[in-house]
Amino acid sequence: MEKIFTLIVILREELVSIAVLAFLLSYCFRTQRTSRDNSFIRICMFALLHAFLDALALITVNNSAFVPALVNGILQKLLYISAIMCINEIFTYVHAIAFFKKKTKNVRIASYVLVGLAALFIILFKGSYNNVNGIIYGGGIPLMVSYGVGIFYQISTILLLIIKYREVGESFCRIMIPVRSEEHTSELQS
């Protein structure tokens, strides 16, 4: 019983994220959708995938006696790639709003090339594991690549929101700038 409670405490952020994202997705699928809604659904699905993989990776890496190292390694790499894919979708969404879909195709292609290169680095390099207060987390070069690309996209998104403030819309910027800044700060702290 104690192990289950400890697991719930460890996974509390992931469980809340999964519940909220699942609720938002179910709401979106039940209502009429616009192209903006479809973009939100893509972002939400990548975020849900990332939260699910985060929970699964935490469970498997902390039970390495029962889970093969290969499975842990694959889950960690998928976790990092899903994070990059999610922030890439947010960036391309904000870019499309800021430039009224002008030049978005080239930016989207370039962003997918960056995601592909980052995924290649993540796949090629071996990760490591860190024990922090009795909880094992992934680390190493794949994590650094994921954080580096994520921080690049965070800063790019914040700059787009600031530079294209009027085009994007004041209310959208009032929501997104603090959210992007908070996520960027939490990435730097980890």
Where in the sequence are the language-model features?
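Interfacial "cap-and-anchor" motif at the non-cytosolic start of specific transmembrane alpha-helices
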Residues: 159-186, 190
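Extracellular-loop-to-transmembrane junctions of the mid-late helices
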Residues: 2-17, 118-160
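Membrane-interfacial segments
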Residues: 32, 65, 95-102, 165-172, ...
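Alpha-helical transmembrane segments in multipass membrane proteins, preferentially the mid-helix core
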Residues: 21-27, 89-93, 127, 147-170
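Hydrophobic alpha-helical transmembrane segments of multi-pass membrane proteins
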Residues: 10-92, 109-127, 177-186
